[in-house]
Amino acid sequence: MYKRQGEESGFKITPQQLENTINQSTKWFILNSPSNPTGSCYTKNELLELANVLKKYPHVNIMTDDLYEHLIYDNNEFHTFASIAPELKERTLTLNGVSKAYAMTGWRIGYAGGNASLIKAMGKLQSQSTSNPTSISQAAAVEALNGDNSFIAERAKVFKGRRDFLINELNSMNGITCRVPEGAFYVFPSCKGVIGKIDESNNKISNDEEFTTCLLYTSPSPRD
């Protein structure tokens, strides 16, 4: 079950919303922080409040996607769920990989930490569906994780500069607003202010899809 969030909540679920959503059929609570595509990042206190709710429901497991853990900006800090709620460790599956922080998307390497029986079952299923990642990908991932990681902070600084530029430009546009993301490398602007306006072709913009169509343009080739 998806629980929609908006700008007013920072695109983050509240403890009360989580509790109201859980029922006997709920199997997993899936959390992505920092988030794709909003860039929202949960604080330690926010995670603790969610953990307090989940303690009441032993039939619900927790899956956390920590792929953007190294891409955090300003004074925000990353906290993984299993570390701030160790009493829920046996019910928590932590997912991560080298795609984002290490710019290794094509190497297709991810990893997980969790209950031993669950990890074993995951390995059995994965080995029969996609076989195994290549040896060179595995060796490269080990080197990335164990090697000099100083470049990560340098890259995060570059991403922050791009974020700041985009936020400034987006918020200077009539009808567009965009909150400042705490992490990852996305911005998630709202185009509510342009709905109902007339585009350059004298057509009324009725929804977000029509607005994105207005943004498309054709770029001639150099030979033209």
Q: Which residues are covered by each model-predicted region?
A:
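Flexible low-complexity scaffold tracts in large eukaryotic assembly proteins
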Residues: 1, 33-36
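Conserved core segment of the aminotransferase class I/II
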Residues: 85-160, 164-173, 177
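Short beta-strand segments
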Residues: 30-32, 63-66, 96, 108, ...
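Conserved small/polar residues in nucleotide/adenosyl-binding loops
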Residues: 1-5, 217-224
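Conserved PLP-binding catalytic core of the aspartate aminotransferase-like
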Residues: 7, 159-160, 175-214
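A general structural signal for well-ordered alpha-helical segments in protein cores
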Residues: 47, 78, 119, 137-138, ...
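Active-site pre-lysine segment of PLP-dependent enzymes
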Residues: 8-25, 37-59, 68-104
